[in-house]
Amino acid sequence: EDNEQLLLIIGATAALQALKSDVASGRLINFDMGIPAKVGRAMDCLDNDKWWGEPKAIQAGLTVILPKSAEDEAEGWKALQDATDIGLQTGVRLSHATYASIANMKGREDYLRDSLKRFESIPVATLNSQYTLLNAMAELQVRHIANIYWMKYEGHRAPTENFSKFWDEQEKPSQALNQLLDDL
């Protein structure tokens, strides 16, 4: 039964990616818009805590992509953040990748920055070794999104480390340090 549930999560995540790609292409792919409702209902059958918060992240992602109201969208963003908290506790970063992907797709830099910070704050030593492949896939996706974001503003890919410490947040040398250098 666990394998079936895992396959359901992977399939639902792929469906969310397909929807995201269709929306980003201006509906050129012609993704069947009946699928998101089915995927959302299917996620109700899964234990959110057992599956690292990804079922609720998928549902929240669908809500953010296809909101019924501004309130629903705001609740969707909150649910995405909550899902990453569960991912942090369970050591699987799939919900973090979902959050970053949705934030990137919607052009919400505030949530994108938050998602990258949340992702990078997870110590590698705490990752669940049983799901190394899923964590590696999540890392590739988040790194790709971070690289696109950094290219947009800085003209180069994201740093290998501290990619969530953004250019406008970089620490400036103190005046005292500058004074010491001037005295040389």
Model regions and ranges:
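Helix-turn-helix repeat elements of alpha-solenoid scaffolds
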Residues: 27-39, 70-77, 113-116
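Flexible helix-coil transition and linker loops at the boundaries of alpha-helical arrays
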Residues: 1-7, 41-50, 85-90, 124-132
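A cross-kingdom marker for long, charged
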Residues: 82-86, 90-184
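Terminal alpha-helical segments
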Residues: 26-27, 52-53, 65-75, 79, ...
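Extracytoplasmic/secreted proteins, especially bacterial periplasmic and envelope-associated proteins
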Residues: 38, 59, 75-78, 137, ...
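Well-ordered, non-transmembrane segments within structured domains
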Residues: 24-47, 51-53, 60
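Amphipathic alpha-helical repeat scaffolds of TPR domains
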Residues: 1-24, 49-65, 93-101, 140-145
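Short amphipathic alpha-helical segments and their helix-coil junctions
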Residues: 34-44, 77-81, 120-124
